[in-house]
Every structure is written in structure tokens, then in C-alpha cells.
């Protein structure tokens, strides 16, 4: 995960002269609204996918010390309890479980890219139906849809054509027309050979795309150790105290 520099230390003015990380842009981090400076916080996955963006005035930064928030969605603990699953401290030390699982799934990693703490996770493959609904980029969607339409159209056509050719070959054999019968049989074999070759090539191509999608789009479940399974109220209270204590260490 990559974050803009002005989102790490809310007590420090953002450095607007620094360039944004690759795959992400920071827009107008020195703008003024009602005479108050603003700063932009953005969180991106490793592949450049933007996970969250928030714009706040500088006067609201002091509230971060008293009200911890998720470092990805920048929301508090009203909807979901905040956790501290890694060794990050200060404003980057708390995160929602659902946000962390979504980020680990999007970035296809199992560790924190800030403190390099490796999380204990379970990865489960997503169902085939989900891939059929959204196989990936637009050109892959068009290819999958086109091949499915061709398969549904060519399969009965090839079957009927092969049956008619074989029926004609049998009729020619009854009338001692062996040359025509051999020609129809050869046509039937060529027809089914081309059909099977196209089917196998298309099937292998889409199987490769599905296996790659299944490997990079797994559902991640964060496993919290049993020793860390505290009641939600006690865990939130401990997380709040530790956040207040560690947030002072981030001031430089």
C-alpha cells in the first residue's frame, strides 16, 4: 500500500513540492477554503488502484489524536471496531478489518508495506460465477462473450452438418457411389477436426485467464490470534489508549 506524504503525519504541513507516487495523483494539496489550508490523503494498492481519498482542512488534524480513524477509509469506529494488527503506530496504527481484507485482496499481498509485518490470513478462491460476470478487462469480456456465442451457434450447426454428411455417405454406398461416399466422410472428419481444434484452443485460453484471475482475486480472511481475541469494548478501549500514546511519537 502506498500513501501520500501528507497523510502520514497529520501534525506536519504537507510537502506539496514532492511528486505523487506512481499510479496516483495528488491534486491541489495547498488550496485554501475559507482561508484555511487543505491537505489531501490518498491510499493506493501496489498495482496503482486508488482505495480511498479524503480532503480535510488543516484545522481538523488535531482531532486525529483524540479520535482514531482507519488509515484506508478515514472513518472512525462507529460502524466497525478499529484494530491494530501490525506494528505501525500513530495515525497509521489503526484500521478496519474489512478495509484491511479488501486491501490485501486488491494488492495480492499478506504483509504491511509500511512495517513489513506479515499478517495471518486465509485465502479462499472466488466462485466461477463471479468470474463469468466480471472476467476482467473489457477486451477479455468481449472475447469471452464472443466465444460463448460462437460455441452455442457452431455446436448445433456442426452436429447437423456432420449428421447430414454421414447420412449422404450411407445413401451413396447403397447406390455403389463410393467416390461420393468417401468425399462426404472426409468432409465430415475435416469439419469435426476443425470444430474440436477451435473448441480446445478457446477452452484452454479461457482456462488460463480464469486460473490467473482466481490466483490474483482471492477472498482474504484476516485470522486474529486467540490471544488477541478480547471483547470488542475492551479492545476498542485499549486501541484508543495506545493510539493516544503512540500518536505523540509521530510528531517530528
From Swiss-Prot:
Keywords: Cytoplasmic vesicle, Endocytosis, Endosome, Membrane, Metal-binding, Transferase, Transmembrane, Transmembrane helix, Ubl conjugation pathway, Zinc, Zinc-finger. Pfam families: RINGv. It is a multi-pass membrane protein. Gene3D superfamilies: Zinc/RING finger domain, C3HC4 (zinc finger). E3 ubiquitin-protein ligase which may be involved in endosomal trafficking. E3 ubiquitin ligases accept ubiquitin from an E2 ubiquitin-conjugating enzyme in the form of a thioester and then directly transfer the ubiquitin to targeted substrates. InterPro entries: Znf_RING, Znf_RING-CH, Znf_RING/FYVE/PHD. This is E3 ubiquitin-protein ligase MARCHF3. PANTHER family: E3 UBIQUITIN-PROTEIN LIGASE MARCH 2/3 FAMILY MEMBER, E3 UBIQUITIN-PROTEIN LIGASE MARCHF3. The RING-CH-type zinc finger domain is required for E3 ligase activity. The keyword RNA-binding does not apply. Its EC number is 2.3.2.27. It is an enzyme of class 2 (transferase).
Amino acid at each position: 500500500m502506498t500513501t501520500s506524504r501528507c497523510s502520514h503525519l497529520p501534525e506536519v504541513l504537507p510537502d506539496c513540492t514532492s511528486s505523487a507516487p506512481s499510479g496516483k495523483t495528488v491534486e491541489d494539496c495547498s488550496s485554501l477554503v475559507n482561508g484555511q489550508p487543505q491537505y489531501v490523503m490518498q491510499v493506493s494498492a501496489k498495482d496503482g488502484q486508488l482505495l480511498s481519498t479524503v480532503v480535510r482542512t488543516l484545522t481538523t488534524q488535531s482531532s486525529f489524536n483524540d479520535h482514531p480513524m482507519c488509515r484506508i477509509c478515514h472513518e472512525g469506529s462507529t460502524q466497525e471496531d478499529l484494530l491494530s494488527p501490525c506494528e505501525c503506530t500513530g495515525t497509521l496504527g489503526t484500521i478496519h478489518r474489512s478495509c484491511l481484507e479488501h486491501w490485501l485482496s486488491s494488492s495480492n499481498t499478506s504483509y504491511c508495506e509500511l512495517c513489513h509485518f506479515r499478517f495471518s490470513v486465509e485465502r479462499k478462491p472466488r466462485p466461477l460465477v463471479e468470474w463469468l460476470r466480471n472476467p476482467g478487462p473489457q477486451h477479455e469480456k468481449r472475447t469471452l462473450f464472443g466465444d460463448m456465442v460462437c460455441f452455442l451457434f457452431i455446436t448445433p450447426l456442426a452436429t447437423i452438418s456432420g449428421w447430414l454428411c454421414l447420412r449422404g455417405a450411407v445413401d451413396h454406398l447403397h447406390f455403389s457411389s463410393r467416390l461420393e461416399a468417401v468425399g462426404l466422410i472426409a468432409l465430415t472428419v475435416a469439419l469435426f477436426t476443425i470444430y474440436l481444434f477451435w473448441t480446445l484452443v478457446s477452452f484452454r485460453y479461457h482456462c488460463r485467464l480464469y486460473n490467473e484471475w482466481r490466483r490474483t482475486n482471492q477472498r482474504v480472511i484476516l485470522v486474529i490470534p486467540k490471544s488477541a481475541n478480547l471483547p470488542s469494548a475492551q479492545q476498542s478501549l485499549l486501541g484508543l489508549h495506545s493510539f493516544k500514546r503512540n500518536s505523540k511519537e509521530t510528531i517530528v
